[in-house]
Amino acid sequence: MALARFRPLAPFLSGDGWAIASASPELFLSRRGRRVRTMPIKGTRPLGEHVEGEKDEAEHTMIVDLERNDLSRVCVPGSVRWPELMAERELAGVTHLVSRVEGRLREGVGLAELLHATFPGGSVTGAPKLAALDEIARLEPVGRGASMGALGVVRGNGDLELALTIRTFAVAAGRIHLWVGGGVVWDSDPDAEVEESWTKARPLLTAVGAPVEELAR
């Protein structure tokens, strides 16, 4: 419940001895009939501060272009639009830049084809997506587990709403795991990237009663 206040539709899934509890602010994919949309997030500041700067804008634009390209693979030509671009929103205890990219699916596109074209979400891979995924697999020492995937509801008629599993806790074997991170580009400042990760983590850790300052040392 403490996490749900960050997003009313925060997804939760549990099984025998494990659970995934998400406070994700990011809509990975929504489908209603043949209308499909995604709302990528890039650019983060502490709550109350403005997100500004060339790096954030360039990174966000890159991801919007990637999402447009992904949706264009399964949508009617010319139907993909981005009616909302780099809007500033207060989400999950921080301030983000959010865009909305949407289109109209081609006749006959099913769930498998839609997910194959769009998964994983571009905001957690970077671009070009396939090359970035290969580099992530080479560089990261452990798997991401439940993090950076998608979780939500798929209905019998094909409609769906999936959150990107960022700001997500995984509980198993008596331990709780939370993954946070950020996009790294050529001119990234390592210290700033670490601080951005803590900016994302602090509200969630505080919500569940974790000793935030101890963990940050």
Predicted regions and their residues:
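Extended alpha-helical targeting/anchoring segments
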Residues: M1-R217
